[in-house]
Amino acid sequence: MQIAPAIAQNQHNLILFVPDGLRPLSVTPEAAPTLVAIRDKGVNFSNPHALFPTFTMANASGMATGHFLGDTGAFSNTIYTAYPVPTAGGSVTPFIENDPILGDIDAHFSGNFVDEDTILFAARRQGFSTAAIGKLGPTLMFDHTERTGEATVTIDDSTGSKQGIPLSQEMQDALKAAGLPLVAPSRKDTPGDNSNAGNFEKPGTLVANVVQQKYFADVAAKVVLPMFKRRNKPFVLVFWSRDPDGTQHNQGDSHLKVLPGINGPTSLASIKNADDNLADLRRALDALGLTATTDIVVAADHGFSTISKESKTSPAAQASYTDVPTGLLPPGFLAIDIAKALALPLYDPDDKNKVVEAGKHSSRGNGLIGSDPEKPAVVVAANGGSNLIYVPDKDAGRTAKIIDALLAQDYVSGLFVDGDIGTFAGTLPLSSINMQGKARTPRPAIVVNFRSYATDCGQPAASVADTALQQGQGMHG
C-alpha cells in the first residue's frame, strides 16, 4: 500500500524509546536530564505499571502487539515450550532473548508464536519505514517474523554475526559511509566489561554498557534517521536501551549486601547512559529538521529491585553448595523445594536432562520434575523475581500439593493458578493478571511471585529472586 505524498507530509513519525528497567524515581535532573525534559515538557503518565510477570520479553510482546500475555504466550524471559528447541541446545525451557531461538519458536508454532501482528509489521504494511535497534530479544520482537532485514531494519547485539538478522545492502552501504562497523560491539567492549556478572566470591561490573549502546545510538542517529528522511515517508523507530537493566543486573556496588543494592554509582551511570542515547536521538532529529513531525514515547518495560537470597524455611537454603554462600538460596531453589515436596527426582533441562543431585542446583535454575524427564510431571521455568510452574497433564491433585508446599515458604508472596485446573485457597486465578487467553505456547499452571520488602535505602525495594546473580545485585519479575 502506498501513502499519497500529501498524506505522507502530514503524517507524524514515531520513536518508541524503551529504557529497560528504569525506575520512575531514578529520573532526576542529575542522572537523566533528557528524560526529565521530556517528562516535564511533554505528557507524563504518572501511575504506570508493567504487565506481570514483569520481564523484558513479556512486556516487549505487550508493547509490540497491544495484547496481554494470555494471548501472546511470551509469559516471561524463560518459558516452557514442550519441545526441545534446537538453537537452545535442545532445552524445553529456553531463554528467549535470542534471535535464533525466537525463530525456532516461531517456526514451531505456525510461523508466529505470539499469533498477533506487531506494530512494525502493521506500520510497514501501511507504507511506513520501520526499524528496531537495541537490546537482543525485545528488539526483534517488534517485527520477529521479518528475518530478511529488507523490510525492517533490525540492529541488536547479534548484528553482523551468523545469529543476527541480516543487514540489507542499503544498510551496509550506509553504515560504511558513516564510518560505522557492520558488526555490533559486545558488552565486553566497554573497558571494565559490562557483561561481568561476578560470582559469590567476586563482585560484578562497575561500568555501564557505554560502548555497545553508543554504537546503537550512532546507527540510529547517523544512519537510520537520515535514511528515513531521504525516503520522504513516515517512519516508526523502536530504540530499546539495555541500560539501566543490564548494568543494574550485573553491578558490583553491593556484593552480597542488600544495601545500597541497585542504588549505587554504577546503576546511576547506567541511567545516565540511557539518557545520553536519547539525547543523541533528539539532536539528530533537530539536525535533520524532523523534530516537529516526530513524536517520542518513552516507556520502561518494568522496574527493578535489589536481590535478596534470604529464607528461613526453604530446604534448598539449608543445603551446602560449592558456589553459594552458606545459608542463602541457590539458583533453582524453587525447583529443588518442589521436587523435595513431591518426593520426585529433579532434572536439568539445560544440561541434557541430567539428574540434579543433593547439594547441586540446575545450571540455569530451571527444572524437570518426575520419574521421566522426557515426560515431566512438573516443569519449573526460573526467571528471577517470579517463576513459572507448569503441570503438563493439568493434574489438580499434584497442583494442590505444590500450592500447599509453596504457601509454607517465607519467600512466596502471591500465587496465580490456571483456572482450567481449579480454584485453590490462598491463590488468585491467572485471569486476574490477564494470563488466561488463547496463547499458542503452553500456559503455566502456577505463577509464583516472590516476597519483596523494604530496606533503609532511598528506593527501598528488595525482592527474593531465583537467579544465578548474587544478593545485592538487581532483578525484576
Locate predicted features.
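His/Asp/Glu-rich, glycine-adjacent segments
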Residues: 67-68, 74-254, 380-381, 385-391, ...
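Short, structured active-site-proximal loop/turn typified by the sulfatase FGly-forming signature C/S-X-P-X-R
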Residues: 25-74, 78, 129-133
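Secreted, luminal/periplasmic, and some membrane-associated catalytic domains
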Residues: 53-55, 77-88, 93-106, 146, ...
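A long, amphipathic alpha-helix that forms part
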Residues: 206-232, 237, 244-294, 321, ...
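Acidic, His- and aromatic-enriched active-site or binding-groove loops in soluble protein domains
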Residues: 69-72, 147-189, 258-276, 316-358
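Beta-strand elements within well-structured catalytic alpha/beta cores of enzymes
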Residues: 11-24, 37-39, 63, 123, ...
